[in-house]
């Protein structure tokens, strides 16, 4: 089973546990006015996941100095990174979150898709050299200038 398949199965199992494993049951929750409670429960579960990730980072802190997160544009990487960083702070760590949005090249240098749209998913859309310099500075515990 791939990691994606395992994640899908985990969420399907959790949906069964909380009694919301079909669209009909979700509609019933919504119509009965219990949607805020469900949202709060989902948020609490997600926060628990962030805490688990922070624990893994804490226990590997001597061997791992950089943690990276990947995903497509607008998938929640920055928000998740900030929440994981907060959980790391609870454990006494001092994380530095780097938002990759700050490393895009100037618009005129951004690659375009075949349809002429800006391709922010392309590696060429990022200033990789500058990002590398910043990561190296972080590893050397230097102050970042942007």
Where is each model-derived feature located?
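Post-Walker A helix-loop "phosphate-sensing" segment adjacent to the P-loop in P-loop NTPases
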Residues: 86-96
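Conserved nucleotide-sensing/catalytic segment adjacent to the nucleotide-binding pocket
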Residues: 96-98, 105-146
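Charged, amphipathic alpha-helical linker segments immediately N-terminal to NTP-binding catalytic cores
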Residues: 3-55
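Hydrophobic positions on the alpha1 helix immediately C-terminal to the Walker A/P-loop
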Residues: 79-84, 99
């Amino acid at each position: 089973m791939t990691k994606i398949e395992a994640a899908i199965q985990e969420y399907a199992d959790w949906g069964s546990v909380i009694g919301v494993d079909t669209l009909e049951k979700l509609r019933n929750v919504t119509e009965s006015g219990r949607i805020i409670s469900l949202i709060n429960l989902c948020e609490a579960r997600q926060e628990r996941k962030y805490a688990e990730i922070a624990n893994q980072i804490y226990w590997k802190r001597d061997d791992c100095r950089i943690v990276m997160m990947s995903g497509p544009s607008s998938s929640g990487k920055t928000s998740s990174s900030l929440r994981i960083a907060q959980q790391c702070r609870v454990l006494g760590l001092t994380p530095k979150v780097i938002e990759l949005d700050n490393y895009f090249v100037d618009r005129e240098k951004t690659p375009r898709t075949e349809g002429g749209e800006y391709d922010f998913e392309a590696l060429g859309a990022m200033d990789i050299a500058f990002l590398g310099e910043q990561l190296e500075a972080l590893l050397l515990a230097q102050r970042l200038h942007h």
